Amino acid sequence: MPTVNVIGAGLAGSEAAWQIAQAGVDVNLYEMRPVKMTPAHHTSNFAELVCTNSLRANQITNAVGLLKEEMRQLHSIIIQSADATAVPAGGALAVDREPFSELVTQKLTSNSHIHVVNEELSAFPDGITVVATGPLTAPGLAQAIVDLNGEAGLSFFDAAAPILDANTINEDIVYKKSRYDRGEAAYLNCPMTKDEFLAFYQALVSAEVAEGHDFEKMTVFEGCMPIEVMAKRGIKTMLFGPLKPVGLEDPRTGKEPYAVVQLRQDNAAASLYNMVGFQTHLKWGEQKRVFRLIPGLENVQIVRYGVMHRNTFMKSPVVLEPTYASKRRPDLFFAGQMTGVEGYVESAASGLIAGINATRMALGETPVIFPETTAMGSMAHYITHTSAHHFQPMNANFGIMPALTVKIRNKKERNQQLADRALKDLATFQAGMNRVEQV
């Protein structure tokens, strides 16, 4: 039986390696860290979370929550590890980031079918291979991808939010509450009056950004847009985004503030909080000056400043099959953000599919296409069937899944039925895969 190569031990690569090893197939898992680090990573652990610590919604009536549940049914290492290291986050699944990546690393390195190779590759190995090197792919391998695909792909930028020392947050001003009181009161909320918001807005739009990037020429994915870029779109833009006050009444007044900045718990000890939606590329001194204008953060200590990364992705509609296999080299699979899926969970899900299909190829079976009615299948279908000319990264969402045969006006009820259909179709599909494996 051939050994499968997996390049990159991020979320997608870790998931792919796990799926392959669980089937009893040997894996060479290549990870260049710590021999060579990237600008975004801080450790040598696998599946390190370089942006937020949130894996977003957990309810199946939300598309990313459904995606997680599908992955649970398929024994995802990423979702198993996230559930095991979860921290309070209302209706979302957020993790204590270091224990999370440490758990993934421990599970993979202790698996007898996985051989870890700490080495930077500049070419594709021979044989069945999953490439999951992420948005910060090293130049040599990036060139190999360009040479294979005949096109350079696209680039965009995303950003990480600051992380704060909880002991320096003013508890006399902030209050604990989740939006609409969903789940436990997991977020700290910094309320703003109109005057406080306007003063903050003016400081934000006039603050200096770090050198090295021309914001006017950037293609920035909406889900990770720097707060200062969002603010420059209009004075009220943030009020409909991360500073939206709806459902966050101040329990001391019973009234809804003009604006609210939310802080999400970042570790199990609750000693760190991150600023929700505050990805930024401001200079570090400016971050301290501007963010201390937020009520409750007057004396806050920033333990990790917001940073910005350059990300790259391929024109998947041109170069990939919905199995995540290359159209030009069928034994070469791609997974993760480089395929145009956007988000932690989406990246891991693509690795799960690529891992299953690499396994099937190693076992002499045909790669499978997941049902489009599932969250996993709809992502694979979208990135390989949408317009290549206008291709942009995509999060999991119900809008890319086939509509129900019956029109339902109530959004929550409609989403519930879409989720029920997805899980039923996944179970049928999974049973069919298992029958093939047993023959």
From Swiss-Prot:
UniProt keyword annotations, A-Z: Cytoplasm, FAD, Flavoprotein, Methyltransferase, NAD, NADP, Transferase, tRNA processing
Known EC number: 2.1.1.74
Highest taxon listed in the record's lineage: Bacteria
Cofactor section: FAD
Primary residence: cytoplasm
SUPFAM superfamilies per the UniProt record, alphabetical: FAD/NAD(P)-binding domain
Gene Ontology, cellular component aspect: cytosol
A Pfam family per the record: GIDA
Positions of FAD binding: G8, A9, G10, L11, A12, G13
Stored InterPro entries: FAD/NAD-bd_sf (IPR036188), MnmG-rel (IPR002218), MnmG-rel_CS (IPR020595), MnmG_N (IPR040131), TrmFO (IPR004417)
Localization annotation: Cytoplasm
Example GO biological process: tRNA wobble uridine modification
Catalysed reaction, written as an equation: uridine(54) in tRNA + (6R)-5,10-methylene-5,6,7,8-tetrahydrofolate + NADH + H(+) = 5-methyluridine(54) in tRNA + (6S)-5,6,7,8-tetrahydrofolate + NAD(+); uridine(54) in tRNA + (6R)-5,10-methylene-5,6,7,8-tetrahydrofolate + NADPH + H(+) = 5-methyluridine(54) in tRNA + (6S)-5,6,7,8-tetrahydrofolate + NADP(+)
GO molecular function, a single term: tRNA (uracil(54)-C5)-methyltransferase activity, 5,10-methylenetetrahydrofolate-dependent
PANTHER family: GLUCOSE INHIBITED DIVISION PROTEIN A, METHYLENETETRAHYDROFOLATE--TRNA-(URACIL-5-)-METHYLTRANSFERASE TRMFO
UniProt similarity note: Belongs to the MnmG family. TrmFO subfamily.
NCBIfam families: gid_trmFO (TIGR00137), PRK05335.1 (NF003739)
Function: Catalyzes the folate-dependent formation of 5-methyl-uridine at position 54 (M-5-U54) in all tRNAs.
Official protein name in the record: Methylenetetrahydrofolate--tRNA-(uracil-5-)-methyltransferase TrmFO
Organism taxonomic ancestry: Bacteria, Bacillati, Bacillota, Bacilli, Lactobacillales
